[in-house]
Amino acid sequence: MSRYAKILLLNGPNLNMLGKREPTHYGNLSLEDIEQRMQELAQQHQLELSCFQANSEEKLIDKIHQSFHLIDFIIINPAAYTHTSVALRDALLSVSIPFVEVHLSNIHRREPFRHHSYLSDIAEGVICGLGAQGYEFALQYASNYLKKIK
């Protein structure tokens, strides 16, 4: 029996405040709501999903490093670190795990400082502006991607 592919859902700073923080940009769902829906979808796709959120760049980097040879695909919403973190970029490059970058809001329709991502050019894909549904699309992509390389 083959093992289920393992997906890591990583969420960056302030995403623990979803549902309370700026609902016009981020929607009304909490992070727990999103994670629960993602767990349901992962089961449907026969994937094992682990979820992790941190407000600290160090903790996100440590989680990425710990994923080396253990995780098959990463779905990451780096939040504000999208625009500032070369260290997060380097961590993702160091483990060579394919990933999709997700943003709830359309970062290109917001303040100019949010338009640049340090991760987009090394990601398999970028999904932004589709709200919580963007995570679902990322999981579907991860499932399809992993089936192709099996």
Swiss-Prot record:
UniProt KW Phosphoprotein keyword: no
Coiled coil (UniProt feature): none
Known pathway: Metabolic intermediate biosynthesis; chorismate biosynthesis; chorismate from D-erythrose 4-phosphate and phosphoenolpyruvate: step 3/7
GO biological process: amino acid biosynthetic process; aromatic amino acid family biosynthetic process; chorismate biosynthetic process; quinate catabolic process
UniProt keyword list: Amino-acid biosynthesis, Aromatic amino acid biosynthesis, Lyase
Residues the UniProt record annotates as site (Transition state stabilizer): 21
Source organism superkingdom: Bacteria
Active site: 26, 103
Catalytic activity, EC: 4.2.1.10
Pfam families according to UniProt: DHquinase_II
Reactions catalysed, as given in the entry: 3-dehydroquinate = 3-dehydroshikimate + H2O
Ligand binding (substrate): 77, 83, 90, 104-105, 114
Gene Ontology molecular-function annotations: 3-dehydroquinate dehydratase activity
Subunit structure: Homododecamer.
HAMAP family: AroQ
Function: Catalyzes a trans-dehydration via an enolate intermediate.
Family of this protein: Belongs to the type-II 3-dehydroquinase family.
Name of the protein: 3-dehydroquinate dehydratase
Gene responsible for this protein: aroQ
